[in-house]
Amino acid sequence: MALKDEFATRNFSIYGQWLGILSMILCFALGIANIFTFRPIIIVFSVITLCFSFVILFVEVPLLLRICPTSPTFDNLIRKISTNYTRAAAYGVMAVVVFLSCIDRTTSLLVPGIFLSFTGICYALAALKGQAFVGSKTLGGAGVAQMIV
C-alpha cells in the first residue's frame, strides 16, 4: 500500500503517526534553536523538547527498538505506548509540557506544542471512533510493529 492509499483509508491513527513524525522533526529542530538563549527556563524546556523528539522517534518507528541498543526499562516504557488511547495521552502530556515553556516567554517552542496537540487529537479521534492502530508501512510496516510489541 502506497502512502496515498494509507491516507485514503481515513484511519486517524495513520494521520497521527505522520503528524507524530512531523512533531518529532519540529521538536528536534526548535529544541536546538531555542537552546541558544540566556533564559535558563527556556534552555530547560528546549532540552526537554529535544528528549521528546527521541521518545517520539522510538514510539512512531518501532523498528528502531530492535536496531538501537537501549535499556530494557526504556523498551518497556515505549512498548506501553502502543494503543491509540495511550498515544493520545502521551502526546497530550508532551504538548502540555511544551506549552508550559510559554509561561516565561513565548518562543518558537509553541509550534511543536501545537503539532503535538494535533497528533494527540488524531490518536484520540482514532480511539473514540474505535479504529484499530494501523502502522504506516512506510515507517516500518504493520507487521514489524506487531512483531515488536
Curated annotation (Swiss-Prot):
Disulfide bonds: none annotated. Glycans are attached at residue 11. InterPro entries: TVP18/Ca-channel_flower. Golgi membrane protein involved in vesicular trafficking. It is found in: Golgi apparatus membrane. GO terms for cellular component: Golgi membrane. It holds the Pfam family Cg6151-P. The chain crosses the membrane at residues 18-38, 41-61, 84-103, 108-128. The gene is tvp-18. SMART domains: Cg6151-P. This is Golgi apparatus membrane protein tvp-18. Belongs to the TVP18 family. The keyword Coiled coil does not apply. The keyword Lipid metabolism does not apply. Its main location: Golgi.
